[in-house]
Design a protein with these regions (language model features):
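Non-heme di-metal
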Residues: 1-158
């Protein structure tokens, strides 16, 4: 509601649309991976629960701060995937295309949440501390989940 700049509003609308498409693609991908025997349903349920808890118990500024951090993490991973062809080397061609699309999609909107943050938190003394706390929160939740989910999928792939 605080965003009045037409260009930023347009970017936010594009971000929301892209995230909706992203969600649909994730559902199709997860379905295919689940059919291959991966424990996707349990992992997806856990992420959904965590996001709902964040919404329930965190102010909107913290939710936005966590979003900024998560978008930053995924953009870093996407940049690495796109820059180093060894990462997808030997992968199924269809899966490699999906992951490349996913990486491109992540890099397209990586700054939108931060741009909204700058508008929403402009001049507020707690802005930096809140953003830093969001980064810490996202870090201690996201990276252990990435490691756990990787481990679970490697185990299931035996």
């Amino acid at each position: 509601d605080q965003v009045t700049d037409p260009e930023l509003k347009k970017a936010v609308t594009a971000f929301i649309g892209q995230e909706a498409m992203h969600g649909r693609e994730h559902e199709a991908y997860n379905e295919a991976v689940a059919k291959a025997g991966m424990p996707v349903d349990a992992m997806e349920a856990r992420v959904h629960w965590l996001l709902e808890e964040l919404k329930l118990y965190s102010p909107k500024s913290m939710q936005l701060s966590a979003t900024i951090a998560l978008e930053h993490f995924t953009a870093i991973m996407a940049d690495k995937l796109l820059a180093d062809e060894r990462i997808m080397g030997g992968s199924d061609e269809v899966m490699a295309k999906i992951w490349n699309w996913h990486a491109l999609e992540e890099t397209e909107h990586k700054a939108v949440a931060f741009d909204v943050w700058k508008v929403a938190m402009q001049g507020r003394p707690e802005a930096y501390a809140s953003r830093a706390l969001g980064l810490v929160l996202a870090t201690v939740i996201f990276w252990p989940l990435v490691a756990e989910f990787h481990w679970r999928m490697v185990r299931a792939d035996k």
